[in-house]
Amino acid sequence: MMKDGMTLSHPDKEVRDYWIEHGKRSRKIAEYMGKETGQTCINNFWMPDGMKDNPIDRYTPRKRMMEALDEIFEEKLDEEYTMEAVESKLFGLGAEAYTVGSHEFYMATASRAISLFVLMLVIFIQQK
């Protein structure tokens, strides 16, 4: 139920609530998988939220996303079985101008609530 290029940052509470519930359930699934396998399951959160054009208000979508993430991660789970990660979005088709989940946004999020922060590094290997 992605709408207008947004999920957790969408102004429509119904859209946000759908993705909040999805996030909560994915955490429980990851914890279950960790318990069943006896290994820590990494649950990576990546949201595609963004806009093609420069918005006047960059703060409000990020505020909505932060509140949604706080709700998703409210319940503490056993890190022996699952650890959460957030992954920033650089840009994408349809979101060239503004990305809600920027690198800086997720660095702040990870420092206060999340176990891991995924750094996407691109390495170019020259083939001979």
Describe the role of every protein-language-model region.
Residues 116-128:
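Catalytic alpha/beta core domains of metabolic enzymes, predominantly
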